[in-house]
From Swiss-Prot:
Annotated source species: Aspergillus niger (strain ATCC MYA-4892 / CBS 513.88 / FGSC A1513)
Gene Ontology process terms (BP): mitochondrial translation
Cell membrane recorded as keyword: no
GO cellular component, one term: mitochondrial large ribosomal subunit
Name of the protein described by the UniProt record: Large ribosomal subunit protein uL29m
């Protein structure tokens, strides 16, 4: 018995009670027909009824790069002329720039792969004592020279691996090691200068002034020279007391002399009233 006959018989007899129906997994149509609502419904649509006749206004609807779906309409290229292949011999030759900056990343013979003889002729690295005597600009220039040279070595190493040359690895690594020692020395010198600058700032905040310290050092040096001269049996003739005093402290010394004299004149007598 088909579905229509079962439904017709159910209408005539007033439908089957649920107890007489087979299980839903055996006859799902019988259960669906009895539980179905009579409310009218329509498919979901977000488009207004008045816009149904205008068609789709989205020109790129359905175009997906993931699913590799092309455009909805065929596109022509007749508007733009297609390029025609040109033989390399017919192309104009370009003159190379002899002083281009990128030549600095290649050896002097301007080849991509440097020879072991060229790599081993690198000399020694800069010592820390030599770098301490250099200025900031010199250290800055030397650092970037090292960076450019290491870039050139890396280019030669990549070309050597690509060609599978089988030689020059030790010479290249040795030259790179010498350059890295120089760079570490530059970092060490700059670190020393940074610590010295921090120490100078700390002393200045505590009230230390290097000018006063230098004047005291000059005074001690003069005192040592006087004691050494007297110890050697030499007579040191000093015409004035000002000769033993630092010029920067001359005013202070004169003020002290006036206070000690108690208002006496140059001849040592008291002033007349």
């Amino acid at each position: 018995m088909n579905r229509q006959s079962v439904l017709r018989l159910a209408r005539q007899t007033g439908a089957f009670p649920l107890a007489e129906l087979p299980p839903p997994y055996l006859a799902p149509s019988l259960h669906f027909s009895m539980n179905r609502s009579t409310v009218q419904c329509s498919n979901f649509s977000s488009t207004a009824a008045v816009a149904a006749g205008r068609g789709d206004l989205n020109k790129v609807r359905g175009v997906s790069a993931i699913h590799r779906t092309g455009p909805k309409y065929k596109l022509g290229v007749s508007k733009y002329p297609l390029p025609k292949p040109v033989s390399p011999d017919a192309l104009p030759k370009r003159n190379a720039t002899p002083d281009h900056g990128l030549w600095g990343f290649f050896p002097t013979d301007r080849t991509a792969l440097s020879t072991p003889t060229y790599d081993i002729e690198c000399g020694r690295s800069w010592s820390i004592q030599e770098l301490r005597e250099k200025s900031w600009d010199d250290l800055h220039s030397l650092w970037w020279v090292c960076v450019k040279e290491r870039n050139r070595i890396a280019t030669s190493d990549m070309e050597r691996k690509r060609l599978k040359a089988g030689y020059g690895e030790w010479e290249s690594s040795e030259r790179d090691r010498v350059i890295r020692v120089t760079q570490n020395g530059i970092k060490h010198v700059l670190r020393e200068r940074w610590y010295a600058w921090e120490e100078a700032q700390r002393l200045y905040r505590k009230g230390y002034r290097p000018q006063e310290d230098s004047q005291e050092a000059i005074w001690e040096m003069r005192a040592d020279s006087v004691s050494n001269s007297q110890g050697a049996g030499q007579l040191l003739v000093v015409s004035k007391a000002e000769d033993m005093i630092d010029p920067l402290r001359h005013d202070r010394w004169e003020k002290g002399q006036e206070e000690n004299s108690g208002g006496e004149t140059e001849d040592g007598n008291a002033p007349s009233n």
